[in-house]
Amino acid sequence: MAKVIGIDLGTTNSCLAISENGQTKVIENAEGARTTPSVIAYLDGGEILVGAPAKRQAVTNAKNTIYAAKRLIGHKFEDKEVQRDIESMPFEIIKANNGDAWVKAQGKELSPPQISAEVLRKMKEAAEAYLGEKVTEAVITVPAYFNDSQRQATKDAGRIAGLDVKRIINEPTAAALAFGMDKGDNKDRKVAVYDLGGGTFDISIIEIANLDGDKQFEVLATNGDTFLGGEDFDQRLIDYIIDEFKKEQGIDLKQDVMALQRLKEAAEKAKIELSSGQQTEINLPYITMDATGPKHLAMKITRAKFESLVEDLIARSIEPCRTALKDAGLSTGDIDDVILVGGQSRMPKVQEAVRDFFGKEPRKDVNPDEAVAVGAAIQGEVLSGGRSDVLLLDVTPLSLGIETMGGVMTKLIQKNTTIPTKASQVFSTAEDNQSAVTIHVLQGERERASANKSLGQFNLGDIAPAPRGMPQIEVTFDIDANGILHVSAKDKGTGKAANITIQGSSGLSEEEIERMVKDAEANAEEDKKLTELVASRNQAEALIHSVKKSLADYGDKLDAAEKEKIEAALKEAEEAVKGDDKTAIDAKAEALGTASQKLGEMVYAQAQAEAQAGEGAQAESSAKKDDDIVDADFEEVKDDKK
C-alpha cells in the first residue's frame, strides 16, 4: 500500500511526518530542520527558493519573497482582512480576474494555492528522500475554522504540488489525535485544544473515548478566528517600533520595503526572546537614511510593554473558547486536559490567559510545532489501511444553507454537525409561473444572507409553469469527510436535477489548476537541471583548483608544450564554468582532466616518493632508539604500610 504522509501546512512554519507500523516520525527537510518556514522567494531567472534559504534572502528581495500566503488562501481581494494585510506586507497583493486576492512577484501573477504548493512540494521531496520511494498521497491539515473555499483552495494546492490529498483534517483534531495516541492509558477524557498559530486561531473541544481497545476522537464543538495569529502579534510590535522611530527621527519606515523586512525579522526574534526573558534589545544599524546621513535603530522592549501591545489579541482568543464550550454543552470543569498548539501559544501571557479561563494548567508534554503533523500522519496511516484502532469524528465549523425569499439564510446543516453528513429540504418558487430558480449557497451564522460567506450559486431551470408555492424543489447538501460541500437541487414534479461541488464564487477553475500543475512539473524539471548544472560546475571548479595548485608546484618539471596544453585547457574550463551550459562545462572539465593527466602522474609519483622516504626515515629513527636503550637493574620495594 502506498504511504500517505501527514503535512501541517502552516502560515509561518510547516511540518512533515509519517506513520508506519504504529510509529510516527517527524521528517527533517533538506536543511536538516524539523520545521520549514512557509516562505517562498522568486528570483531573477525563474529560480524558486523555499523555506530557510528563502527567508535568509528576504531583506534584499522583499518584494518577491512571499510569506503568510495561507492568510490569503480562499479570500477575495476586497475582504477587509486582506485589505488590512496589504498595508503591512512588503510584497504586492493584487486583485485577480475572479476577484480573489493573488500576489505579484517577478512580474508574474500567482494564486495563494500556487504559492502554498511550493511548500508542499518541498515536503513531498523530503518525504521521498527519507522513504526512498515516490510519494503521491497526503493528509493535509487546515484550521478548524476554515470555510469551504479555503478547504477547496488547500486541496488545489496539493494537486498543484503533485499530491492526491486523501483527506483534509482540522489542525486541533490532528493535535488531539497525536496527544491521544501517545497516551498509553484507556481513560476517556475531554480535551480542549487551543491552537494559536502563525496566522489563525482555533479552539476545539474533543472527546477521546476508549471503545474495546480502539480510540474514538469525537469533536464536540469548534470555533476560531482565521485572521488571528503570531503574524498579528509581530505586526503590533512592528507598528510600535515604526511609531517610536518616527517620533525620534521623523522618518516613516513603512515606506521602505527593505526596512520593513528587517523589522519583521527583528520583531519575530524579539517576541521569541521575550517568552524567556524580561527584556530584549532591537539593534538595526543603517535601517534607513535621509539628507543628514544614515539612521540607526536601537530600542529596548520589555515583556510588560509587549504584553500591553497585544493584550486585546489575547483577549480575542478567549471569546471563541467560551462559545465552543457552550456549543459542546460543557463547562470548564468538564475539561480534563488543555493542550496548547501553535508557536504563539508559547508566550507566557497566552498560557496565563488559557490557565485563567479553563482553571487548570495547560499540558506541556505536547510539542506545539509538531503535534499537528504527527496527527495528520496517524490519519494517513489509517487511510492507507496500516492501522484501524483510530476513529475520527470531525465537525463542520460553520452552518450551511441557502438564500431564501426576503434575503434571509435558511440553514440546512447547523455548525458543529459531525461529518460526513447529508441534509435535504423542500423549497418552492416565489412567483407565479417561475421557470427557473437560483440556488445561492451560503456559509455562516448570520440571519441576513448578505452577511454570510457566499460559496457559489447555480440554476435549476425548466420548472413546469405553476402558481407560486406549488412546485416542489428538493435541495440536498452533502458534506464529505474533508468538510467540502456538494449541493444538488431536484424538481420533484419533473425529476429534473442540477448539482455542483462547491468551488466557491472564487477559487481556481479546473483549467487553471491543470495549467499550474503543468507549470509546477516544468519547474521541477528546471530545478533538476539547475541541480545538475551546479553539481557539474562544482566538480569542474574543484578540478580547476587542483590543476592550478599542481601546476604551481610541478609546472617547472614539465616541458613547455605540455605546460602550454594544460594552461589552454585550464582557460577554456574557467570560461565554461562562468556560463550555464552543463554539456560545455562537462566537456571542458573532461578535456582538462585529459590534458593534465601527465601532471597528475607526476604529482602521484612525487607523493609516493615522499611517502617511501618518510617510511625509511622512520625505520632508521626507530633503529637508533633501540640502540639507545639501557638495561637497568631493579629491586622490588615492599610497602610495609599496607
Curated annotation (Swiss-Prot):
One of its GO terms (molecular function) is ATP binding. Induction: By stress conditions e.g. heat shock. CDD domains: ASKHA_NBD_HSP70_DnaK-like. Residues 628-642 have a biased composition (Acidic residues). Residues 608-621 have a biased composition (Low complexity). The keyword Lyase does not apply. Keywords: ATP-binding, Chaperone, Nucleotide-binding, Phosphoprotein, Stress response. The modification Phosphothreonine is found at residue 200. The keyword Nucleotide-binding applies. Residues 608-642 are annotated as: Disordered. Belongs to the heat shock protein 70 family. This is Chaperone protein DnaK.
